[in-house]
């Protein structure tokens, strides 16, 4: 989801649906099975496709009256590696991909940057790349039109200037990253001590790498998301909401297992989703 647009892909199938809430939506038909899809804020969609010995990342404009396929980025798995993750910039002009190349006794991970402006066209859309050695890349995600986060098991890098990508912020942690959440202007990491799964520390940074908060937490959770000034932890039947100033807002154990909790425009009302229902819940004010 990005802006007013959301993409829904038939994974292993050959259809991707794009909606903006204003019409019935449009459909992209692919020639190969779909692995994953990401959408930009104007409806341009990046779809990773699976072939027998290769992967193809296609960029489509499903609202175009002409040819909807804008760019095709092929990847040979045996030569360039297996794709781990990818993202498309909110403006639809850049894509970042992460790959793992397996050797006989070790592996290497790397990221590649593609740009679809006149600069990228001069270079067959590939405008840069970087190796992360044997650090496993967990996530690549655009944090603005021109900045992308690359997170690995021991830290992260933020690259800027997507026409000529370069590292603008970099940080390494002594502990392993358990979870990562990206907000509008902040990054939240839960770090875990090796050999002590119960020792968890939440670190909050701005996009320039300045630490905004550090706090030990003891939540049992499976998923962490950040919305505005709140971080929502969910897992099995529990939900914890922590404000970015370090104060707990909500701590509750539900009777049923929950899949997700989302905020609404009303700061005390949330949308709760479980396996069979979608409902509104209102927090009690103290």
Give names to the regions the model predicted:
Residues 14-18, 53-60, 103-115, 153-160, ...:
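Structural motif
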Residues 20-23, 61-65, 116-119, 161-164, ...:
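Short loop/turn segments that connect beta-strands within beta-propeller blades
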Residues 22-29, 67-77, 122-131, 165-172, ...:
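A short beta-strand motif characteristic of beta-propeller blades
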Residues 1-98:
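Non-cytosolic head/periplasmic domains of membrane-anchored proteins
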Residues 53-151:
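Solenoidal tandem-repeat scaffolds enriched in leucines and small polar residues
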Residues 1-4, 32-43, 77-87, 128-145, ...:
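Repeated scaffold domains used in trafficking and secretory/extracellular systems
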Residues 191-286:
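Hydrophilic extracytoplasmic domains
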């Amino acid at each position: 989801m990005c802006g007013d647009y959301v993409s829904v892909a038939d994974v292993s199938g050959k259809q991707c649906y794009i909606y903006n809430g204003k019409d019935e939506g449009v459909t992209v038909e692919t020639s190969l099975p779909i692995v994953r899809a990401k959408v930009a804020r104007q409806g341009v969609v990046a779809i990773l496709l699976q072939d027998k010995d290769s992967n193809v990342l296609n960029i489509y404009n499903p609202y175009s009256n002409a040819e909807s396929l804008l760019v095709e980025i092929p990847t040979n798995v045996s030569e360039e590696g297996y794709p781990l993750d990818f993202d498309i910039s909110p403006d639809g002009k850049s894509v970042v991909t992460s790959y793992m190349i397996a050797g006989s006794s070790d592996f290497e991970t790397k990221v590649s940057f593609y740009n679809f402006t006149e600069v990228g066209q001069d270079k067959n859309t590939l405008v840069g790349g970087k190796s992360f050695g044997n650090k496993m890349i967990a996530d690549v995600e655009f944090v603005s039109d021109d900045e992308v986060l690359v997170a690995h098991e021991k830290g992260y890098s933020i690259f800027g200037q997507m026409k000529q990508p370069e590292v603008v912020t970099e940080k390494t942690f002594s502990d392993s990253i358990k979870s990562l959440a990206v907000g509008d202007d902040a990054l939240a990491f839960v770090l875990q001590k090796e050999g002590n799964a119960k020792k968890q520390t939440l670190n909050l940074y701005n996009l320039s790498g300045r630490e905004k908060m550090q706090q030990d937490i003891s939540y049992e959770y499976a998923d962490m998301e950040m919305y505005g000034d709140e971080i929502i932890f969910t897992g099995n039947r529990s939900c914890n909401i922590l404000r970015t100033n370090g104060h707990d807002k909500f701590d509750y154990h539900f009777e049923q297992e929950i899949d997700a909790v989302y905020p609404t425009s009303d700061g005390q009302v949330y949308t709760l989703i479980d396996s069979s229902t979608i409902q509104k819940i209102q927090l009690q004010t103290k």
